[in-house]
UniProtKB/Swiss-Prot annotation:
Pfam families: Chordopox_A20R. Keywords: DNA replication, Phosphoprotein. One of its GO terms (biological process) is DNA replication. This is DNA polymerase processivity factor component OPG148. Plays an essential role in viral DNA replication by acting as the polymerase processivity factor together with protein OPG116. Serves as a bridge which links the DNA polymerase OPG071 and the uracil DNA glycosylase. Belongs to the orthopoxvirus OPG148 family. Interacts with the DNA polymerase catalytic subunit OPG071. Interacts with UDG/OPG116. Component of the uracil-DNA glycosylase(UDG)-OPG148-polymerase complex; OPG148 and UDG form a heterodimeric processivity factor that associates with OPG071 to form the processive polymerase holoenzyme. Interacts with OPG117. InterPro entries: Chordopox_A20R.
Amino acid sequence: MTSSADLTNLKELLSLYKSLRFSDSVAIEKYNSLVEWGTSTYWKIGVQKVTNVETSISDYYDEVKNKPFNIDPGYYIFLPVYFGSVFIYSKGKNMVELGSGNSFQIPDEIRSACNKVLDSDNGIDFLRFVLLNNRWIMEDAISKYQSPVNIFKLASEYGLNIPNYLEIEIEEDTLFDDELYSIMERSFDDTFPKISISYIKLGELKRQVVDFFKFSFMYIESIKVDRIGDNIFIPSVITKSGKKILVKDVDHLIRSKVREHTFVKVKKKNTFSILYDYDGNGTETRGEVIKRIIDTIGRDYYVNGKYFSKVGIAGLKQLTNKLDINECATVDELVDEINKSGTVKRKIKNQSVFDLSRECLGYPEADFITLVNNMRFKIENCKVVNFNIENTNCLNNPSIETIYGNFNQFVSIFNTVTDVKKRLFE
């Protein structure tokens, strides 16, 4: 007889199986462990282990329409498709980036709200979110049983950002052209850039997507950063005429291989242009592009997830957290705080600056040493004043790439610890 615990496991296995395409590595590992359990318990359960699943929602969206077409009579819901990084939240209870399959940490209140929405309707396959300028918007909800409008209303009650949408009855064959597209785009009446419009006909599950645009080339004058939150900065690409080209995040900047004082390909919409990442933008390797972008942005910033952050105060916070002492705003405060604890002072004295700085940032030791062995440093008064990576091939390792993107932060902490150690023991 099947036990209550077995039923719980089987239900979880079925739920994970249905959402495999939207799963991250953690969810896949859980799924595989349940498959192994099910096979050993029941011999045959009808599903198999998986090694890698590409996150995809293509079954729910038809081919994108790039040219004018006739739309049939009927009742429709029109939704904006926003510019930004697309994520899927599904029964696996993880926010997973479309395409890469990488999971993304979200605030507890957003996770709780998403779970409440999913639990309200067991026919929901997934919630679609977009992340732009560190702001989450739920832009679609796929359910077998109800319209996304109903789910939007519930999501809004739970505190999630939802899109403006249009409910329209079309009474006769209508040409959907640039003019109608522009009217609808304006009717959504919000400030977020929209890359396309999707629509659903009443009674149908599959979305249609309309994306009218033109390709163009623009001359890049500079690459800068814009502040979008508390020590969060997004890349900004400026043309010779002073216009901004929209960039999703740091990875988008890298993939496009954009370089100052060159032309780049863009998708031109009605009111803005989007940086287009394609192979024609150059022959540089990803590692070479990362090095150049970081050199361009400057030593005051480091890669922090999808965005940039400024070195300095964040480094002091990580150092005080590692030492388990009160937060300090300056090096003077840090020295005073360390002097209050003999244990902390001995730790500073006995551990190398190199190791303590690395541990503060949680870098894997082997990957960190591999990176350092491919770099050259300029040292003055025991502090790093400059560094250069001599072989970018090591950046093919994603972990090493992440460490290098964050290396300005390491240098800041290293120099701070060096300064603190001198004041304490010399």
